């Protein structure tokens, strides 16, 4: 059985990942800024590399309709964690495998790195 603290952390970071999928957060640069480290970068499922400053425009990261499933947390240290999960894009029907590295800084967890990889049919990550 997993440590209760690890279970709580898994729930907390999953909630943060889900926040990053919400229109309210994705379209609000101030909200995004609080969830991403200053040196955040992403390898998008499109193949494009994104940096935090790319997402800080008036519209933020833009709106999406996605469903998260299969969330897993892998502790790297007391202040770093890797998350893996699957996303279903409700608009296109496409699926991607996702991974993120989260760092705890100044008492809060922020995303440092994110990657999306196009996936085939549903399967276990």
Question: Which role does the model predict for each range below?
Answer:
Residues 2-34, 39-125:
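A beta-strand edge to alpha-helix "cap/lid" segment located at domain peripheries
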């Amino acid at each position: 059985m997993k440590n209760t603290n690890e279970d709580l952390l898994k729930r907390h970071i999953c909630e943060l990942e889900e926040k990053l999928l919400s229109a309210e957060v994705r379209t609000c640069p101030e909200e995004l800024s609080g969830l991403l480290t200053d040196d955040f970068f992403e390898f998008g499922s499109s193949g494009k590399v994104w940096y935090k400053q790319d997402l800080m425009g008036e519209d933020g990261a833009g709106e999406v309709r996605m469903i998260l499933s299969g969330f897993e947390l892998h502790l790297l240290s007391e202040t770093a964690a890797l998350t893996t999960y699957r996303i279903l894009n409700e608009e296109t029907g496409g699926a991607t495998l996702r991974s993120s590295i989260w760092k705890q800084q100044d008492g809060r967890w922020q995303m440092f790195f994110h990657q999306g990889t196009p996936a085939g049919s549903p399967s276990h990550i």
